Amino acid sequence: MDKFKIRGGQPLSGSVTISGAKNAALPILMASLLPSEKITLSNVPDLHDVDTTLELLDCLGISHSNLNNNSVCIDPTTLNHFKAPYDLVKTMRASILVLGPLLAKTGKAEVSLPGGCAIGARPVNLHIEGLRKMGAHIDVENGYIKASVEGRLQGAEILLDTVSVTGTENLMMAAVLAEGETVIENAAREPEVIDLANFLNSLGANVRDAGSDTIHITGVNKLHGGEYSVMPDRIETGTFLVAALATGGSVRCEKTDPASLDAVLKKLEEAGATIDKGDNWIAIQSHGRPKAVNIITAPHPAFPTDMQAQFCALNAIAEGTAGIRETIFENRFMHIPELRRMGANVESEGNTALCHGVDELTGAEVMCTDLRASASLVIAGLVATGETVVERIYHIDRGYEGIEKKLQGLGADIERVTA
């Protein structure tokens, strides 16, 4: 398996171009089976999870062709299967997002229960119960969700018990071809949900109020083709900004969206950074050792859970002591034992971690456990004295496009070693 070798101690400096958002690209790719004509997507990140999603569409009979510059053309008119097999779904929890659109388009769907990062239960009950309210008959047997509906799905009022991004997206995609009006209450408000709604509307859907906690969808008979550009990745942006501050550097992120990062930017300023921003760029300037900052993760527009591990690495070398409380996922502190191997003074119990900043980290062999934990270990390696070896980086390849090349462009001493 590939690994990273990092020799830390160099401040990051320069500009980096941000890729398309993984968490927007995946649902948009799944939604690409809904229209009756070809679509072309641009700013699609080159990631393992994107490749898996395209493989999944292939399994459904949907053909695609990769164009230049992170673009892909998808032809949903060749859809001729309705089963998402375990071999593909086991590697990626987002595979559950095929359930709603596949059921809406074909009237039946068989989707294996999902896999992906080992960071908690992430139950699919919300998806199933919502689709049942829309008239679907659903059984869960032999590890598969087996869904069917006679005729079209029916519009319904759906109250989500907990805020769920994928639950909101799955039901939104199902509702665009349903008969009548669907209302999703307690909906997720993440920017990626808005991007999915904008994509669907560009194809002729009628989705309103995405970005609020109540989304209204009026079903249409069919969707047409079109072209769409995936939004920039706010988590990749945040990761580079944290890396810049942790190393005492100065970095400008290009082709990003500052409006989607308010909570993160406020915490970076609280940690001592100077932030400048324009319509599609963010620049960060460090001023000595960062200050430790308290973090509480919560659904958007609060602090995103996908940035928690990176700030844990930042707090590990910051001045002072700060707490981190994780309210979204259980079991999301798996990076902490690895950071301790590098000399971090971080303790955790339940969903809370306490970070006591140390003067320096030292290089060590560490192991990735999930996508965002991987990013925290890379940041720690960039700061540490000596050499850090980061193992099992297939986790980071799931969500960061060419991260080592982008870091090299900012002056980092990092290399990918192929086993």
From Swiss-Prot:
GO terms for cellular component: cytoplasm. Its main location: cytoplasm. Phosphoenolpyruvate binds at residues 22-23. It is an enzyme of class 2 (transferase). It catalyses: phosphoenolpyruvate + UDP-N-acetyl-alpha-D-glucosamine = UDP-N-acetyl-3-O-(1-carboxyvinyl)-alpha-D-glucosamine + phosphate. The modification 2-(S-cysteinyl)pyruvic acid O-phosphothioketal is found at residue 117. Signal peptide: none annotated. GO terms for molecular function: UDP-N-acetylglucosamine 1-carboxyvinyltransferase activity. GO terms for biological process: cell division; cell wall organization; peptidoglycan biosynthetic process; regulation of cell shape; UDP-N-acetylgalactosamine biosynthetic process. The active site is at 117 (proton donor). The keyword Cell wall biogenesis/degradation applies. InterPro entries: Enolpyruvate_Tfrase_dom, Enolpyruvate_Tfrase_sf, MurA_subfamily, RNA3'P_cycl/enolpyr_Trfase_a/b, UDP_GlcNAc_COvinyl_MurA. It comes from the Bacteria. It is found in: Cytoplasm. UDP-N-acetyl-alpha-D-glucosamine binds at residues 93, 306, 328. Keywords: Cell cycle, Cell division, Cell shape, Cell wall biogenesis/degradation, Cytoplasm, Peptidoglycan synthesis, Pyruvate, Transferase. Its EC number is 2.5.1.7. Pathway: Cell wall biogenesis; peptidoglycan biosynthesis. SUPFAM superfamilies: EPT/RTPC-like (SSF55205). HAMAP family: MurA (MF_00111). Belongs to the EPSP synthase family. MurA subfamily. Cell wall formation. Adds enolpyruvyl to UDP-N-acetylglucosamine. This is UDP-N-acetylglucosamine 1-carboxyvinyltransferase. It comes from Idiomarina loihiensis (strain ATCC BAA-735 / DSM 15497 / L2-TR).
